Amino acid sequence: MIEILWFIFDSMLVLLLLALAWTTCSTQDVMRAVTLFIAMGLLLAVIWARLKAPDLALAEAVIGAGISGALLLSAIKDYPANVTVSDRTPLMRGMINLFTIALTILMSWAVWHGINMSDGVRLSERVASQLSISGVSNPVTAVLLNFRAYDTLLELAVVLTAVLTVLILNDKRADHKAISPLFQGMTRWLVPLLVITSGYLLWVGAHAPGGAFQAGAMLAAAMILLQLAYPSVHQGFNLYLLRLLLVIGIFTFVLVGLWMMVRNDDFLTYSPAQAGSLILIIETAATLSIAAALTLAYLGGRPAGWENGLKKNESDNHTYTDNEETK
């Protein structure tokens, strides 16, 4: 009986996910599409949890729905009120449909080809057999930060590239109006809890669901809440420290990899005795970089003084000297 109920529940999840995806793509109201996208992200988190993938469920809820939703809602402010998606011509609609069908066929073939080429040994079994030398007891962390650490390094590079593109293209969005004191009071309670939760996710990632991406997104959520409650809080940011935090993740990753290359002749190949400590160091630096990157992405561009803080100070000094000479 319980199995039947779970089957009905899973079937409803799949049908609801397909309905949300279709409605999100077909609606012409941008605000409605963003709201449905956030709801779809939360539903995906539930589905990942049902598939016994808690790390993916946590990442989907925090990043896929939470941070991405905040970014989309912030971007909507750049559009006029009641903006809608323009009607597509039949030719454009047909091209999109053909591309979607072709992509579906290609992905289906890739999955089928991968199953046929498999030797029958599941990846989880291979990871479990090598888990004792990984430095951690969580297989997901072992794969991301040890066995396939190079992939994670490239993911951090992708995040950095995306944020640098945002900083190059735009200045920071204009501050919104002040929020009610009730929301500000709630923020004073929520932000410390989010920071503590971020630290917990970072630490627990070695042996349970969590890790740098989830912790960094949680820390960025705390900064976004502060920005929403106190629109001018970003003016107190130390821009030089923010730049350092933005690159410290990749810098630490590469530094550890080069150190391992000198000692072991292989890039990012940790010795079993040092693997746990090195993974914790890398994850701590990556958490700070991810938090800084997502916070800057939410701001929508360069904060005031980002480009030429030193030049501004020099010009102020020259102005002061000229005024003294005039007097």
Explain the meaning of each model-derived region.
Residues 1-327:
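Alpha-helical transmembrane segments of multi-pass membrane proteins predominantly involved
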